[in-house]
C-alpha cells in the first residue's frame, strides 16, 4: 500500500486522490490545524480517530463516513493503531468545474454542522466498494 505523507495531499495536476490509510498517514499530514485544499471523504472501517473539523471536535468510529469541505480547517489529534480509513479527495478546481456546490447548496450547512454520519454496516460495504473502485481507477 502506498504510504501517503505529503502535506499537499491535493496536487494541482491530479483530479483526485484515493488511498487506504493503514499507517496513520492522515494523522501525520494533519497533526496541526491546516486548511483542507480539496473535498475529502473518509470512510472508517475500524478503530477510531479524534479530529477537529471546522473548529468542532469529533470522534470518527467504525462505519462512519466523513465529509470535509474545501477551505475547512482540519486537525487530527489521535488515530488508534488499528484505525483503517479509506480516503477519497477531489481537487478544488475539479469541483469548481462541475459546479458541485451550486447543485448541493441546500445541503452545505448540514455538511458543515454534521460532517460525520454513522452508517449501517451494509451501507458501509456499499461505500467501501465504491471507494475501492476509485482506488483502482486511480492506479490505471
Model-derived features: positions:
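Generic protein-terminus/edge-of-domain signal
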Residues: 1-59
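A short, compositionally biased micro-patch
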Residues: 44-46, 69, 79
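Amphipathic alpha-helical segments enriched in hydrophobic/aromatic residues interleaved with Lys/Arg
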Residues: 109-140
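Short acidic-glycine-tyrosine-enriched beta hairpin
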Residues: 55-69
Amino acid at each position: 500500500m502506498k504510504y501517503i505523507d505529503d502535506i499537499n495531499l491535493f496536487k494541482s495536476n491530479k483530479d483526485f486522490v484515493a488511498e487506504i490509510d493503514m499507517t496513520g498517514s492522515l494523522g501525520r499530514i494533519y497533526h496541526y490545524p491546516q486548511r483542507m485544499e480539496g473535498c475529502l471523504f473518509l470512510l472508517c472501517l475500524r478503530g477510531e480517530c479524534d479530529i477537529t473539523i471546522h473548529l468542532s471536535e469529533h470522534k470518527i468510529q467504525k462505519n462512519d463516513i466523513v465529509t470535509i469541505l474545501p477551505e475547512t480547517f482540519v486537525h487530527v489529534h489521535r488515530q488508534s493503531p488499528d484505525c483503517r480509513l479509506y480516503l477519497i479527495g477531489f481537487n478544488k478546481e475539479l469541483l469548481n468545474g462541475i459546479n458541485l456546490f451550486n447543485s448541493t447548496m441546500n445541503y452545505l450547512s448540514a455538511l458543515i454542522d454534521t460532517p460525520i454520519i454513522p452508517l449501517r454496516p451494509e451501507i458501509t460495504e456499499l461505500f467501501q466498494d465504491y471507494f475501492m473502485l476509485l482506488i483502482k481507477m486511480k492506479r490505471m
